[in-house]
Amino acid sequence: MAIKLINIGFGNIVNANRIISIVSPESAPIKRIIQEARDRNMLVDATYGRRTRAVIITDSDHVILSAVQPETVAQRLTTKDDESDE
């Protein structure tokens, strides 16, 4: 299985094979997940001080904050999948 990388904004790249979900940060359960990840030192803030627009949860229980919309990240992920099928 080839490693697929996805840009999550500002030159930050994540292994697409490790992503479980991409969600919006507004709901209380997601805010709780972010706080728990911060407490466990499993939070990666890739927003460069900008507003968090997407929360990426990985299979290693890392939580990654991104300033890019969840739809944009999902589109980049889908585009990468389509390119690998060719």
Swiss-Prot record:
Top-level taxon of origin: Bacteria
Protein name as annotated: Putative regulatory protein BBR47_37350
Disulfide bonds: none
Family label: Belongs to the RemA family.
HAMAP family for this protein: RemA
Coiled coil: none
Organism: Brevibacillus brevis (strain 47 / JCM 6285 / NBRC 100599)
